[in-house]
A protein has these predicted regions:
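Start-transfer (signal-anchor) and selected internal transmembrane alpha helices
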Residues: 1-27, 115, 121, 204-212
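Hydrophobic/aromatic-rich transmembrane helices and adjacent perimembrane loops
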Residues: 100, 186, 305-351
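Membrane-interface transmembrane helices that cradle and orient dolichyl/undecaprenyl
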Residues: 118, 147-150, 155-169, 196-203
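Transmembrane-helix signature of polytopic, membrane-embedded enzymes
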Residues: 15, 94, 104-136, 152-153, ...
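Extracytosolic helix-loop segments that constitute the early lumenal/periplasmic catalytic or substrate-binding loops
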Residues: 27-30, 46-71, 78-79
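Hydrophobic, aromatic-rich transmembrane alpha-helices
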Residues: 271, 280-308, 312
Length: 487
């Protein structure tokens, strides 16, 4: 059991499960991209970064900000550099392909981890399947690309190497995961604390796991307190501003948690931005979905609960209510941790394996369906509810948009609505509406993804361009306009 062997003959059931899962993931992810349900933030931004890295230059924030700053100041994500050569082949689909493959690999990590001992071995296919259908997994795949998904998929392999006491490989995986995003290292600090608790009886394990914890914490502090502020030319980590309820910086947050523990716990459950009434009870329903999907096992194996503490805090206390619920990529880290805790618990039950597995699968699918159908907002449903017709049905004829896109030269700078940026971003210069900058072309829809403008403001913008002597209308298709800057 010391080697991971992926022969089809030995692990045919796992390969078939993975193949079916990849088809499902493609239906979720690629369909959204084809139908313009991927956006400037974040797939467009990261695809534009791929282009820069593939041409041996640093990526910047010009796509979505007026000023041009190094993109590493926003998130210290080195995966984009690593994956950039693939963009020569897959273009705007590159990161979606990488993300789907990574999740498939994460399922194999679960499979081989459960294969380690006789008690959990009968559950390996069940565990793999449940992992793929977990609400956090599918929600992440339905929304663009994010590097924390790639990091999370290495967690089962990290657990596997720690369990085998393969400390060199475990450290290599730890470093790899840290490279995905600066806040992943904070998550890994708590993961290491949980593992320290789990393996406390083994002196050798304690020593190495404490080293992992120290490395993760040091990496996090160096990134957010020195490296990223230096790159940004700022005094502090820019994303601390998303947590005014905690004080807005790391020191204030720690002080608030220590001095007001009951209020801190209360805030994890209530809408702390009451002006957004549609998000009342959003956090409570998220916890309900998490418990039904297997989160109850975190209380039976509390060292796994320790691991998810920073994810809950960063998810539920931000001033962006869209992160509080079950949608988007903000629940992906729960997938490996909850699944592994769940399998550890049920593998000790003296019941029929298939009955247990089927019951767990029922609760997983039920919680996922509930999360997407009942907890997603009306404007999100077509993206997430992949088993219904609206997921495959565009709101308008997209052929006209694609014809207009084909008229834009590949080397031209372009500004477009957010929904179009995802497919246009693989070029030198691409800007999200309404940042015109030095764009040579503008592809604008009066109704599609007009944020941050209202429909009325967007129509006023289009009318102003039509009378602007520096622009000419190349072609109009229904509500979509292609403008070219005059020489």
């Amino acid at each position: 059991m010391n080697k991971i062997v992926l022969s089809f003959r030995t692990h045919s059931a796992a390969w078939i499960t993975a193949a079916l899962a990849f088809v499902l993931f493609g239906i979720v992810s690629f369909t959204n991209h084809i139908l313009f349900r991927t956006y400037a933030l974040d797939l467009g931004l990261y695809t534009n970064a791929l282009y820069d890295y593939a041409h041996f230059r640093f990526a910047d924030t010009s796509l979505f900000l007026p000023e041009n700053k190094n993109l590493l100041a926003d998130h210290f994500d080195l995966y984009l550099m690593l994956f950039s050569p693939l963009s020569w082949i897959f273009k705007s689909y590159t990161l979606l392909v990488v993300q789907c493959v990574a999740v498939i690999a994460g399922g194999f990590g679960v499979y081989f981890l459960l294969n380690e001992n006789e008690e959990s071995r009968p559950f390996r296919i069940w565990g793999m399947t449940i992992f793929y259908l977990f609400f956090g997994t599918l929600a992440a795949l339905a929304y663009d690309y994010h590097s924390n998904v790639i990091s999370a998929m290495a967690i089962p392999f990290f657990f596997l190497t720690v369990n085998r006491k393969a400390w060199g490989k475990a450290f290599a995986l730890l470093v790899f995961m840290c490279l995905g995003k600066e806040n992943v290292s904070l998550f890994l600090f708590f993961v290491s604390l949980g593992l320290f608790w789990k393996y406390f009886k083994w002196k050798e394990s304690r020593k190495y796991i404490l080293f992992f914890a120290a490395f993760s914490l040091l990496y996090f502090l160096v990134m957010v307190k020195w490296v990223m502020p230096t790159i940004a030319g700022a005094d502090d980590f820019v994303h601390f501003g998303k947590y005014p309820v905690l004080g807005g910086d790391m020191t204030a947050a720690i002080k608030f948690i220590v001095m007001h523990p009951l209020e801190f716990i209360r805030l994890l459950f209530v809408n702390h931005m009451p002006e957004n009434v549609i998000y009342n009870n959003e956090k409570v329903f998220f916890y309900l979905v998490l418990l039904v999907s297997g989160g109850w096992a975190l209380f039976v194996r509390p060292w796994y609960f320790v691991m998810i503490i920073p994810i809950i805090i960063q998810k539920e206390l931000t001033n962006q209510p869209t992160t509080w619920g079950c949608s988007y990529q903000y629940s992906i880290e729960f997938a490996p941790v909850v699944l592994i805790a769940l399998m550890e618990v049920v593998s000790r039950w003296k019941w029929n394996v298939n009955r247990i597995g089927a019951l767990l699968l029922f609760f997983t699918v039920s919680s996922t369906v509930y999360a997407f159908v009942e907890r997603s907002k009306s404007w999100e449903k077509a993206r997430f509810i992949f088993w219904q017709k609206p997921h495959f049905t565009p709101l308008y004829d997209l052929n006209g948009v694609k014809i207009l896109m084909d008229r834009i030269p590949a080397d031209a700078s372009v500004m477009a609505n957010s929904a179009y940026v995802g497919q246009l971003a693989y070029r030198d210069k691409c800007y999200a509406f309404p940042l015109v900058k030095d764009a040579e072309y503008m592809l604008i829809s009066s109704t599609e993804a007009t944020y941050p403008f209202t429909y009325e403001q967007t129509n006023e913008f289009i009318q102003s361009v039509q009378v602007d002597s520096t622009w000419q209308l190349v072609e109009q298709r229904d509500h979509v306009y292609l403008f070219q800057r005059k020489p």
